[in-house]
Amino acid sequence: MNFLSKQEQMIKKSINELGYNVDEVLLIPSSRKEFGDYQYNGVMSIAKQMHKNPREIALDIIEKLKDNKDLVNVNVQGPGFINLSFSEEALVNYLNEVKDNININYEYDNKKTIFLDYGGANVAKTLHVGHLRSANIGEALKRLAEALGNKTISDVHLGDWGRPLGLVILEFSKRQPDLCYFDDNYTGVYPDKSTVTNEDLMEIYPTASIKAKEDENYLEEARIVTKKLQEGHKGYNELWKQIIKVSSEDIKKTYTKLNTTFDLWEGESDCYKSIPEMLEYINTLNITKKSEGAVVIDVKKEDDEIEYPPFMLIKSNGGASYQTTDLAAIFQRVKKYNPDEIWYVADNRQALHFETVFRAAKLTKIAPDVELVFAGFGTMNGSDGKPFKTRDGGVMSLNNLIDLVKVESEKKLLPNIIEDRDEVAQCVAISAIKYADLIPFRTTDYVFDLVKFSDLNGKTGPYLLYSTIRMKSLLANAKKENIKYNNVEMIDDNTKEIVLNLLNINKVLIKSFNTKSLNEITDLLYKITNSYNNFYSQVRILTEKNEKIRSSWLAITDIVYQNNVKLLDILGINVPERM
């Protein structure tokens, strides 16, 4: 159990021994440091239940807490707010435990198996800035879950089976009608070598999409091609496989730049295979009805504050809907992986869609015991407050965004970084992009400021990297000069704030896990780093004459460095050797 949790349990035990039965004690950082480092505000609730004066109860409690040697300066303020600080001995013991085992800060009892669906890449299309937040938030949530000891399974869930693929195949058939894929009578072996390049796809899909909007006949042809593809047309399926392979390789390269990985590279096509079995099961439940030629499930509830449309199981043309594909994904995932929870990381605007799917999953008992979570996010906007665009108003590709930030980041690197300058600039750029993307609460929109987010000063990824690298360099220099350090032996005014920030790691991680938002981790990481830098600027660690003080300072530096690296890793940010 981590330090704060232990203290809360001990205080709870003391309070209950006085006859005040409380279920939990929560210590929060005090807003008035002159009274103490932490505050307990639960006395008012106890007083209400016991019909007693809250200040009298608070005085009873602090008298009892005098027996706890880990606490100092226990006092009551106002009507019954208990303030306290931890003894230097208790904090020193905590630091030495963490130094020997950093995982103390990353404990979590209620471990689960969690399936995460994020990324949302579409085959035959380039990844653009609209895909950034799903990748960053999803990857960080996965790493957070793993850091707390949960088992995770992640899936990119490619958009690889709908009309966009029909459009691409149709346009190929218009341009190269003699290819064997379009000959219904072809009986030979299809080519091993792909006839499709990613450059082809980047041009073909936009062209086909425009044609479909302008020409109803072209759109109808695309519908027919899509239907034939989904019904198993051999030639179309062979070409489709090539499109998937080529496009997926390009998508993987971009995700790799973002330090984003997936256990599964499955897509809508994989879920499509489960639809017949799922429909057969649903048909036994007698919960569907016909509506204008379609088969639907009513998912409305009496206490709904908004109008929920019915879940469309089968469209009026006999095809499976997009909702059905997502329900089939849940059906397949529950059956194959038996997760405790499934998290979907997608744009806020998909909230109604997913809530409808989740309700259908519960009504059909496809996922009766699985918690289905929609982790919606806001948009990344430009300086005009509208979704981020290129200068000419187009949608910016993710690669272009990364390159822009990389150019800005490269300007900040030391001139003596020559050999791996490009690699380091890339690492710094990704830190700028990811940290900025994770600072706001998940559901909040934010404005992307290229210059601000690339700055080496302030609340930025590059600032955190630079500071963490400096810690590592300090420890390396101590080793070079044969300056040894072991345990923390003392905490002074210079290091107290650092320690108090470190104490909050476990609580912040668990809260972030529960809210599915990384903003409090980004905030705590900045506080830890900033408090360390304030300390660093006030002392001369390696030239300190007092060995006890110097050893403690170096040990604390080591602890902060270890936690910074781990917290940055949770956010999906790598620390380069230098910058």
Language model region names:
Residues 1-92, 108-579:
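Non-catalytic interaction-recognition regions
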